[in-house]
């Protein structure tokens, strides 16, 4: 399965719908957390935008609150964190309409260098779990909010 980052704005804010490039402007402020992925995405994709930077270790919900309260225009959020925030704070934010995820990350495991045989064994086991539907069942059972993770597309569809 995959984790994805999306752009979130205040509910009712349509300025960036179908044109996220408008965000790359000094008049718009992006809420980021130092050292967190949102700060790297902002620097690479929206370098001209203003930044509301919060210190490392700040809870991600503070980026959400900064947008909801009007201190920032946009937050770059992991879809699963945003879904949990919206479950607890309905109607405060929304994903920018017409925008694909700004980043997609395959969930992986770190292994010791030189563990090629272990890695290959795990790859086969994980593919088997994905193809059998087991991973989807586990995600459905444990996701705080349904569909807050992106599923892997199966190579053969019927």
Kindly give the residue locations of the regions a language model identified.
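Periplasmic-binding protein-like
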Residues: 1-9, 87-126, 145-158
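Ligand-binding clefts/hinges and TM-proximal coupling segments of bilobed small-molecule sensing domains
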Residues: 35-52, 93-95, 126-158
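A ligand-binding cleft/hinge motif common to bilobed small-molecule-binding domains
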Residues: 40-44, 68-69, 73-103
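Hydrophobic residues within well-ordered alpha-helices
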Residues: 23, 64-68, 109, 122
């Amino acid at each position: 399965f995959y984790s994805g980052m999306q752009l979130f704005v205040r509910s009712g804010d349509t300025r960036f719908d179908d044109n996220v490039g408008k965000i790359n402007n000094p008049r718009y402020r992006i809420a980021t957390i130092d050292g967190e992925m949102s700060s790297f995405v902002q620097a690479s994709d929206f370098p001209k935008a203003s930044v509301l930077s919060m210190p490392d270790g700040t809870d991600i919900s503070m980026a959400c609150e900064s947008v909801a309260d009007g201190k920032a225009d946009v937050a770059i959020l992991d879809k699963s964190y945003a879904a949990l925030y919206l479950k607890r704070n309905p109607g405060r934010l929304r994903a920018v309409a017409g925008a694909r995820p700004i980043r997609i990350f395959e969930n992986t495991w770190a292994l010791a260098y030189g563990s090629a045989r272990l890695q290959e064994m795990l790859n086969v086991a994980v593919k088997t779990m994905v193809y059998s539907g087991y991973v989807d069942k586990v995600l459905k059972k444990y996701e705080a909010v349904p569909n807050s993770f992106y599923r892997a597309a199966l190579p053969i569809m019927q």
